[in-house]
């Protein structure tokens, strides 16, 4: 179907607006012509997908959500950790999404910070919001205690340090960018010693 080829992942309401009924989509699903990813979410069975297809699925369901923390760090290739769930930030008053797959780790950003340091990335035809490398590192230091069942035995500080080290080594974030981002949220006193230690002999 053209709409699926063009968009990759399509909501049911998009089909309906194109004149395709829900009953037709159900028949196509039973015939194997489309795959149901989640409630009201479909793609072609042979659609090319990237390593971060789960991010695209989440963004289609939660278009204002922001991929953050460990998921953002992995997306920017700044850690060897492979998160078992997608870390997604939503606003303080947004309803917590119910999604059977992929598994989510939902956090909340304030209205002030929900759009600060955010990048747009096209993943499998979907516009996905991801925290920029500097913002990602600052967030990991701000919330450096272990969070979620996947990280109970993995200290958050270690992941933050790995991200900082790799971001500086790969030139994906400069000390100035990290400092500026940290100052905006009042976390520079916490992060500064680590940045200075890693750049002292650079």
Annotate each language-model stretch with its function:
Residues 1-70, 98, 194-202:
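Short beta-edge/loop segments at beta->alpha junctions of small alpha/beta modules
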Residues 12-16, 77, 125, 148-151:
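Short helix-to-loop capping/linker segments positioned immediately adjacent to catalytic or ligand/cofactor-binding
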Residues 14-17, 28, 33, 64-67, ...:
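Hydrophobic/basic alpha-helical segments enriched in Actinobacteria
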Residues 18, 90-91, 131:
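Short His-Asn-centered micro-motif
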Residues 51-53, 112-124:
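Short amphipathic alpha-helical segments and their helix-coil junctions
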Residues 118-202:
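Hydrophobic alpha-helical interaction segments
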